[in-house]
From Swiss-Prot:
Gene3D superfamilies, A to Z: ATP-grasp fold, A domain, ATP-grasp fold, B domain, Succinyl-CoA synthetase domains
HAMAP family attached to this UniProt entry: Succ_CoA_beta
Record EC number: 6.2.1.5
Protein name in UniProt: Succinate--CoA ligase [ADP-forming] subunit beta
Length: 387
């Protein structure tokens, strides 16, 4: 689950980090009042969406008066912001953040952390190249990114943070401020179950103060039951409508841009299914994992989700029966095809628990389903069914 910038800053501030002060505004009048309330000569109005690249997309503007703040807010709120991280429709802007002007600054740094699944540790990343896309830095100048793996048994140690500060070229009071920032960020990461966080840029002001000018936090959705207050911050308007609907039925769904709908049980098998569709010249329209314990109701909802996509011209169902029985899946497929009125070709590959019984149920159904003997055969048939 993602947080908005203003929510991320509030959370980080509660852990002792110095952040760029700001006020969230849900309409132009509130934006104008926020400018006056901040009391500076300048302010920055930022669209609050769950996507990066806001500045290049026109979602971040410097304003010099309350009237300008009102006008910028009016141009953003109620519209969709399209960035390089969104789809063509963009993300809806329901609010803007009006933040204090912290510039000029002497330096812009980058600080982030992620759960590194290969090392099974929280890994911090820091760089002198703040204020730009860190992905570009990683690609073009990987040597400029410092990495620190945190031993989960002892946590982040002050000496590790100091070492990073030295390598970033900080000095004097800046070092202590940075250590406090990094230790506070780690404490927030662990206590709030972050999956990822970024401060980009982490600015060094002319007076030596270190301030979080931006904040991005992604929470581990599997741990949200432990954090009802954080769960209350969820903004469903920023989530893909289909993916949101899928999560309500315990389906893992990600929309793609192809025309072959996929229904698979198991994330690994789903990835392999998409790969082999590509290998045979097709393009998957989605990633859809119905789970190891798929029920008849879940399969029906999965069909509805797939067919909600107008680009889908064929469907490949790939089920490996383990916990789930193939005969139950076959019955669910038949019921779903009848209920949803499927008009596109449907290729079905069943293997494992009661696969033969499931295949017979499908064959006796009278429906125009295309059976497949293996994964390669299924991919070949679904691609050829497109004509």
């Amino acid at each position: 689950m993602n947080l908005h910038e203003y929510q991320a800053k509030d959370l980080l501030e509660s852990y002792g980090l110095k952040v760029q002060k700001g006020i969230v505004a849900h309409n132009p009048n509130e934006a104008a009042q926020a400018f006056d309330q901040l009391g500076g000569k300048f302010a920055v109005v930022k669209a609050q969406v769950h996507a990066g690249g806001r500045g290049k997309a026109g979602g971040v503007k410097v304003v010099k008066s309350s009237q300008e703040a009102r006008e910028v807010a009016e141009s953003l709120i109620g519209k969709n912001l399209v960035t390089f991280q969104t789809d063509a429709e963009g993300q809806p802007v329901n609010s803007v953040g009006v933040f204090e002007d912290v510039y000029p600054v002497t330096r812009e740094l980058y600080l982030g952390a992620v759960v590194d699944r290969s090392s099974r540790k929280v890994t911090f990343m820091a760089s002198t190249e703040g204020g730009v896309d860190i992905e570009e830095v990683a690609h073009n100048s990987p040597e400029k990114i410092l990495k620190v793996e945190v031993d989960p048994l002892v946590g982040l140690q002050p000496f590790q943070a100091r070492e990073v500060a030295f390598k970033l070229g900080l000095e004097g009071k800046q070092i202590n401020d940075f250590v406090k920032t990094m230790l506070g960020a780690y404490k927030a990461f662990i206590e709030c179950d972050f999956a990822l966080f970024e401060i980009n840029p982490l600015a060094v002001r002319e007076n030596g103060e270190i301030v979080c000018v931006d904040g991005k936090i992604n929470l581990d959705s599997n741990a949200l039951y432990r954090h009802p207050k954080l769960l209350a911050l969820r903004d469903k308007s920023q989530e893909n409508a289909k993916e949101l609907k899928a999560s309500e039925h315990e389906l893992n769904y990600v929309a793609l841009e192809g025309n072959i709908g996929c229904m698979v049980n198991g994330a690994g098998l789903a990835m392999a299914t998409m790969d082999i569709i590509q290998l045979y010249g097709g393009k998957p329209a989605n990633f859809l994992d119905v789970g190891g314990g798929a029920t008849k109701e879940r399969v029906i909802e999965a069909f509805k989700l797939i067919l909600d996509d107008e680009n889908v011209k064929a469907i490949l169902i790939n089920i490996f029966g383990g916990i789930v029985r193939c005969d139950m899946i076959a019955e669910a497929i038949i019921e779903a095809v009848k209920e949803v009125n499927v008009t596109v070709p449907v290729v079905v590959r069943l293997e494992g628990n009661n696969a033969e019984k499931g295949a017979k149920i499908l064959a006796d159904s009278g429906l125009k389903l295309i059976p497949a003997d293996g994964l390669a055969d299924a991919a070949d048939k679904v691609v050829k069914s497109l004509g």
